[in-house]
Design a protein with these regions (language model features):
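Eukaryotic scaffold repeat domains enriched in small/polar residues
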Residues: 1-325
């Protein structure tokens, strides 16, 4: 088949939809997150159907997309966010899970649990018993964490993107310290703060970037949580990654955007927003998906060589590799 190339200028990519191959014994049940380790291996988390309890939620592939291993049935039914962090000579996975699983955890790259945490009741914003409940609570008194971002001191930030709409700060031992945000109309308040990242690109003070998804914006904060500014012009931005001078923004509205050093778009990849309007529930109809067009990008990350991996919130799952041309 002819190659599909998308992008513009210096940012052109060869599209490989359905890049990693799952063994027949597993199925993708709504892919949610992607991350890569130092060796270039790919980690994918899917939500998973809670009825299929013994099915893994995390899948590992080599840089060519060949299956290595799977684990994480404890997150099945709520698997959401995944990030890889180097700590000394080791690397670890940080997992966020929502729905009835509603927890976050630190794992080794082979799936052993280092620690496992539920709602931080000391934050004072959660319903009684939220840390032991296994029913999703979609109110602002619920805990439904979506993604994490890593701080220099070994601690991290956790976005409670579907629950309290707060950003929680933890130390390196996963002890809760403080939080900021909550529900509101912007400028430090959120509607679905779904994604989070620390922007450490050169030539600027490090900033916290929060995907304020339902407002179609990115909000920027100083590392102490002080609100700085808002970037507009997105379509349900879901998460963030950075590499060199670029920032990557997967948008649920059928687009993966690359921002340059001044945070203006330098490429909008696979954008097909009109198609979402034309075809109801396109996410459930793979026969209507078009090569080189996205449906619902939910997470994306750069590889060390500047390729991009994209996870889409679609039925049956889809992980696309965009190989730099």
């Amino acid at each position: 088949a002819a190659e599909t190339i998308i992008g513009e200028g210096e940012h052109r990519f060869r599209v490989q939809h359905h890049f990693p191959q799952l063994p027949d014994r597993f199925t993708w049940q709504t892919t949610h997150g992607v991350a890569v380790d130092a060796a270039g291996n790919l980690y994918v988390i899917h939500e998973g159907q809670k009825e299929l309890k013994d099915h893994p939620s995390i899948f590992v592939f080599d840089p060519e997309g060949r299956f290595i291993r799977a684990f994480g049935s404890e997150f099945q039914g709520g698997g959401h966010g995944i990030e890889v962090r180097g700590e000394g000579n080791e690397e670890f996975l940080y997992i966020s899970a929502y729905q009835g699983v509603k927890c976050f955890a630190k794992l080794t790259l082979t799936g052993e649990i280092v620690w496992f945490r539920k709602a931080p009741m000391e934050a004072g914003c959660y319903a009684e018993g939220e840390n032991i409940s296994t029913k999703p609570n979609w109110s602002r008194q619920g805990f439904l964490p979506t993604n994490v971002a890593f701080l220099e001191d070994g601690g991290f930030l956790l976005a409670d993107g579907y629950g309290s709409f707060r950003i929680h700060r933890y130390d390196k031992d996963a002890t809760w310290l403080s939080s900021f945000g909550g529900e509101g109309e912007g400028k430090g308040r959120f509607q679905t703060p779904h994604g989070i990242w620390i922007d450490r690109r050169a030539g600027r003070e490090p900033t916290i970037v929060v995907c304020d998804r339902a407002h179609d914006t990115l909000q920027l904060f100083a590392l102490d949580g002080t609100y700085l500014e808002t970037l507009n012009g997105f379509g349900l931005p879901a998460n963030i990654d950075t590499s060199n001078e670029l920032m990557l923004v997967p948008e649920l509205k059928a687009c993966v955007t690359i921002l340059g050093p001044d945070n203006t778009p330098v490429a909008r990849l696979g954008r097909a927003v009109e198609r979402l309007d034309e075809i109801k529930n396109l996410r459930t109809q793979p026969d209507k998906w078009i090569d080189g067009q996205f449906v619902h990008p939910h997470d994306a990350c750069f590889t060390a060589t500047g390729d991009i991996l994209v996870a889409e919130w679609v039925q049956g799952g889809r992980i696309t590799k965009l190989a730099r041309v």
